[in-house]
Design a protein with these regions (language model features):
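Two-component/phosphorelay signaling modules centered on CheY-like receiver
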Residues: 6, 13-33
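C-terminal output/effector regions of signal-responsive regulators
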Residues: 124-125, 131-212
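Receiver (REC) domain switch/output surface
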Residues: 95, 112-124
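Alpha4 helix (beta4-alpha4-beta5 surface) of REC/receiver domains from two-component response regulators
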Residues: 66, 86-102
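Active-site beta3 strand of CheY-like receiver
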Residues: 47-54
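C-terminal output helix
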Residues: 89, 107-116
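Active-site residues of response regulator receiver
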Residues: 56, 83
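Acidic catalytic/metal-coordinating carboxylates
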Residues: 37-40, 61-66
Length: 212
């Protein structure tokens, strides 16, 4: 792969840590953090903010899956999980915590580089999907605001739907701002005006009843 990554590695075995520190630069990557426990990995990732994590599962004080979950809560990054054996339950946990690749020891050089590329590509795809979902949610919220403001203009100014929308567009153009910003201003102004209107209605004298 062309991209050079800053990588954090964690394993309770010194030989494995040394191996990863030696082999990753051969792919053009920089090892920025090395840890022997899960908690140490979490702390070093907070300090270094790596692009990718390669971590063993079985480690003292906090296993690799729990450490990866904690790291990704702080800032999402791709994680490659390493284990001495296949374990169905561990794989299910790993899936829940968004582990993007899984390697079984002994790690071969021919397997490591593709795993890094796959994890990075999957992470970028997931991030794009999350952003798309966030954009969609924001678009729906914006549409709701605009519809509410349009309905308010129809009620207050006696406009039909098209006229109300054109007025929103004209106001946005005059103020050089987005349609949703104009809608928010109109709704905010209405919220401020409602107590005044209610007080005025309350103090307005009622109809006189004829006497005699």
């Amino acid at each position: 792969m062309d991209r050079h990554l800053r990588i954090a590695v964690a394993d309770d075995e010194l030989d494995m840590r040394d191996y990863l520190q030696a082999i990753l630069p051969c792919f053009g990557h920089l090892v920025v953090a090395v840890a022997s426990t899960g908690r140490e990995l979490v702390e070093k990732c907070r300090q270094e903010r790596p692009d990718l994590v390669i971590t063993d599962i079985k480690m003292p004080d906090m296993d690799g899956i729990a450490a990866a979950s904690q790291i990704c809560k702080d800032f999402p990054i791709p994680v490659i999980l390493v284990s001495a054996y296949h374990d169905h339950d561990l794989l299910e946990r790993a899936g829940e915590d968004h582990i993007l690749a899984f390697l079984v020891k002994p790690i071969k050089q021919a397997d490591l580089e593709p795993a890094i590329a796959i994890a990075t590509r999957r992470f970028e795809q997931f991030q794009a999907l999350r952003q798309e979902a966030a954009d969609l949610r924001q678009a729906l919220e914006n549409r709701k605001l605009i519809e509410r403001a349009k309905g308010l203009l129809m009620k207050r100014a006696g406009l039909d739907e098209n006229e109300a929308f054109r007025r929103l567009q004209r106001l946005a153009s005059e103020r050089n701002c987005k349609l949703v910003e104009v809608a928010a201003m109109i709704l905010t102004a209405e919220e401020a005006y409602q107590p005044v209107e209610r007080a005025r209605d309350k103090n307005r004298p009622g109809p006189r009843h004829p006497t005699g």
